[in-house]
Amino acid sequence: MELDIENFADLRDYLTRQEYVKLGEAVSFKNLHGGVSNRTVKVAWPDGRGWVLKQALAKLRVNVDWFSSPERIGVEAKALRWLNRLAPPGTTPTFVFEDMANHLMGMEAIPEEHENWKSILLSGQIVSNHFEQFGLLLGAIHRESSKSKSKFESKPGSEISREFADTTYFESLRLEPYYLYTAQKTAEATAFLNALARETLLQKDCLVHGDFSPKNTLIYRNKLILLDYEVVHFGDPAFDVGFALTHFLSKAHHLPQKRVRLASAAELFWQVYSDEIEQLDWARALGPRVVRHTIACLLARVAGKSPLEYLTPSEVARQRHIVLALVAKTPTTVPDLIANFISKIETYAQN
């Protein structure tokens, strides 16, 4: 029977057998909540050391049936090892171990003084430098991984594009529950979403995180640290950018007093990111795809399998109405999209 890391007695026995913990050693365990696709537990030693263990679930913890093979933990472990080399130093936790039999991986924990960026944003704290760092981080990952032969390749034939060619988990955890499910439920956007999903799988430009959001970002000593890599693949950079912009714009919708600042911060993120990748051959054609991915994700987060939990029912209805208008008449640039979305939110709220 597979280990359940949320059973702390069994987890202690497992770590002892694997010689990660000494017999009788005083370690503590704590469930970490917030994700839907994994069990996540922190292991802490008295000397201050800590690990975070992640165990992939076959059935995700949401209100509708949503399944994905727990074998994806192997992708997450491989992605973290690569990102430890690709991303700027200190922006990803250090990989420790993986156990495919138990669909489990371990990484070093970030010290307790950290905060979750999503929580910070929802509290109304908007720090421009955090958005700059976010753009720099994504730009670095996309830029450093975009060459067909990465300077980090470990052996002949191990180009990063081949290492992450499989899009199975991206499809089951992103395209299906976000785009295809929403397409089935929203007739006005069916053609738009289905076409975008097909197009996305044809783009093979760089390493794509697939879950690039404030929820998966910790802030420690004012530095951003990126988590969660289970849908990493070699694909369309526009998805990452649109996914991130969706979170900024949805929070701008939810927080009217911070709306202007969040919109400006979203533009800052886009500009910093654009500067980081402007020399790449695929950069010139990126903007319109980013617009479409942002629109698709904005709709999916109110009509798909994973709705944003902080939006009220009236905000869900408003966002759906506004995004469908953007589907019908799509802006061509990211700044135009941001301005359009904010303007429509303001107009709708006043009526």
Regions from the PLM with identified roles:
Residues 1-29:
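Juxta-kinase regulatory segment immediately upstream of eukaryotic protein kinase catalytic domains
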Residues 30-53, 194-239:
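Active-site acidic catalytic loop and adjacent metal/ATP-binding pocket
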Residues 1-10, 108, 141-150, 156-199, ...:
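Active-site catalytic-loop/activation-segment of kinase and kinase-like phosphoryl-transfer enzymes
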Residues 78, 238-280, 294-313:
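Active-site activation/catalytic loop segments of kinase-like enzymes and analogous catalytic loops
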Residues 20-27, 77, 189-202:
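Short Pro/Gly-enriched beta-strand edge/turn motifs at strand-loop
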Residues 257-260, 297-351:
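ATP/Mg2+ or Mg2+-diphosphate-binding catalytic cores
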